[in-house]
């Protein structure tokens, strides 16, 4: 399922949202083993997994500890950075070849100022 298709299961996509999707989102192909967000960095991107599988993990005392898996149609972000404005506690890695759409959280915040639909959706 594409990101716009997923959105239409929850909301009606109007012109403002369509413009956001066309100008503020980017789709990337990620190879298995690629880290798209590193622990201890500031990453304010929101990701949607169109295809593949991602995981979040951290290192502690030399051990790699998986905290979550994100299959297709999942939305994820480093909430530490977005909401607490601190470096991420977790890394995000593709554990299969994946197709991922991302956008900056700040751009979604701007859209929320003019789109009640997105403002309400983002609070779910």
Language-model features and meaning:
Residues 25, 43, 64-65, 87:
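Short coil/loop residues immediately preceding or within conserved phosphate-binding loops
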Residues 36-41:
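Short phosphate-coordinating micro-motif centered on Lys-Gly-acidic
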Residues 55-65:
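A short beta-strand-loop-beta hairpin characteristic of the jelly-roll/cupin
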Residues 66-124:
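Cyclic-nucleotide recognition modules
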């Amino acid at each position: 399922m594409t990101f716009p298709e997923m959105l239409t299961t929850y909301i009606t996509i109007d012109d403002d949202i369509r413009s956001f999707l066309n100008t503020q989102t980017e789709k990337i192909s990620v190879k298995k083993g690629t880290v798209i967000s590193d622990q201890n960095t500031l990453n304010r991107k929101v990701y949607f997994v169109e295809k593949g599988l991602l995981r979040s993990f951290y290192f502690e005392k030399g051990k790699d500890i998986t905290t979550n898996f994100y299959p297709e149609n999942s939305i994820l972000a480093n909430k530490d950075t977005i909401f607490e404005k601190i470096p991420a506690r977790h890394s995000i890695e593709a554990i299969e070849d994946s197709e991922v759409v991302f956008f900056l959280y700040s751009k979604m915040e701007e859209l929320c100022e003019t789109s009640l639909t997105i403002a309400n959706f983002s609070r779910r």
